Amino acid sequence: MSFTFLDWPRAEIFSSVSYLGLLLSGTVLYTVYKLIIAIYNYFFHPLRKIPGPPLASISWVPWYKYWFSGYMHRHVTRLHETYGPVVRIGPSEISFISATAWKDIYGLKRCRQIERDPQSFPSLTPNGARFDVLTYSPIDHAKYRKILNPCFSEKATREYERTIHENVDKLVAKLEQNISRGQKKNGSRENVTNWFQWLTFDMVTDVCWGRSFECVANEKSHVCLALSMDLVSYSSFIVFVAWWKGLKDFLVKLSGVEGLFVHLVRSKCEEHHLIAAGNELTGEKGKASIYSNLRAAGDPLDLAELDGNLTAIVIAGSETTGFALTATSYYLAKNPACFRRAASEVRSAFASAEEINDDALRKLPYLKAAIEEALRMTPAEPNGLARKVVVDGGLDIAGEWIPKGTAIYVSQFAANRSSAYFHLPNEYHPERWLGEECPKEFRTDKLDAVQPFIMGVNVCIGRGLAWMEMRVTLAKLLWHFDWTVKGGDGEAFEQAKAWHVWTKSHVNLQLHRRGALYGDL
């Protein structure tokens, strides 16, 4: 059978329209389309009255540029200094910095009207599902919180204190060895970024399973720690293609990074089973752990949920606390007067390091203030945790009407460094947190704009444990050591890049035995 009759229209069409003409026509149509969208976004979009740079209101190019650079947090800070407490930083994305915005976006009353934005913090499972407390579903989130809450209660956290002390004591012993090897006059130059990352990873895995990965003992990152850093980094990259689900799923599947991490988590669970079985045979009582508490829960998690939640706890519990310890130790080193006051408070409270305990540490106001000020200066999540308005008709957020589908958040770095909210916002002054003892010049600071653990239904479930880890670690280090920082050793930290979390810029401190720098305090 002949199909020559199919050839004549094609020949006629392509004889009158060239390929180049088709390409030019397509380009013109696409340009006109994008121009129409830009005009709409600038002149007619419901967010048109929100202040911000004109280009950001019509295009996502500036957003991607600064996100890719790693300096989005500093860019947004400059925008808020220019435009005020509410800024449009993308066609459908709004950044806030006020305390009112914290309550309106993250508060309990809005938990079904404002949900996590999956494009801003995409899942690293190939099908986009989440089986952990970071889930996008408010119903699943409530379920996981209910099961996990007993693991992080005041009673449970107190049971973990022994584990915290054991791990911190290992770090102190390592640092003392290093000082002994070096020249007493110069002390020992220590990369505290690595030490604190190893320590917090050891602590969180020990708290999770009753046994750590021994990063401090081996003085190197366990493969599981390296994978957790890869997971965080990869999630920051995936933001670029989160809107294209097919490509995102392909890249996630191609990397396989979460699967490797979950495999290690599961092997740790199996190891815990073997240890628990041995303890049952010998009658020995095992250490308190999150995993043992989860196994004993009345509504136990299935395997995928167990893997997902333990993965989330390990990554969040080590990454953020390790950085907070690095920041606090660095700022104390950079401000000798602050170091002397913090060290004096700790050393006056305890006759020996063995007496240090968390109940007593809670009563030390300056130690707490030193940590709080470091969390203000360098919040663990500098760019904000995005939420999306999902209710029809929109919502009023901090006095601005925000339509459905808009991504909204409080930019923590911008809020914490705002000159409208803080006196000397870029300087480290723990005394601003001392309540009645706060100096006059800091009494108008808007301290409620600082929420390092978020608030409302999504408040960090492990904040009590994190505070214990930070108090015990810093107190023992302040009791044992003096430290300072040399001129160039803090530059990388001061200019660190950040995506979902900060890059690991090395902070090198000069560590000395107690009294070597500042005498008896």
UniProtKB/Swiss-Prot annotation:
Subcellular location: Membrane
Pathway: Antibiotic biosynthesis
This protein's record includes keyword Iron: yes
Any one GO molecular function term: monooxygenase activity
EC number: 1.-.-.-
Residues binding heme, per UniProt: 460
Glycosylation site list: 178, 186, 191, 309, 416
PANTHER family: CYTOCHROME P450, CYTOCHROME P450 MONOOXYGENASE ASQL-RELATED
Record family assignment: Belongs to the cytochrome P450 family.
Pfam families to which the protein is assigned, alphabetical: p450 (PF00067)
GO CC terms: membrane
Chief site of localization: membrane
GO BP annotations listed: antibiotic biosynthetic process
Domain of life (superkingdom): Eukaryota
Protein known as: Cytochrome P450 monooxygenase sdnF
Source species of the chain: Sordaria araneosa
Membrane topology per record: Single-pass membrane protein
Name of the coding gene: sdnF
Cofactor needs: heme
Keyword list, A-Z: Antibiotic biosynthesis, Glycoprotein, Heme, Iron, Membrane, Metal-binding, Monooxygenase, Oxidoreductase, Transmembrane, Transmembrane helix
Transmembrane segments: 19-39
Function: Cytochrome P450 monooxygenase; part of the gene cluster that mediates the biosynthesis of sordarin and hypoxysordarin, glycoside antibiotics with a unique tetracyclic diterpene aglycone structure. First, the geranylgeranyl diphosphate synthase sdnC constructs GGDP from farnesyl diphosphate and isopentenyl diphosphate. The diterpene cyclase sdnA then catalyzes the cyclization of GGDP to afford cycloaraneosene.
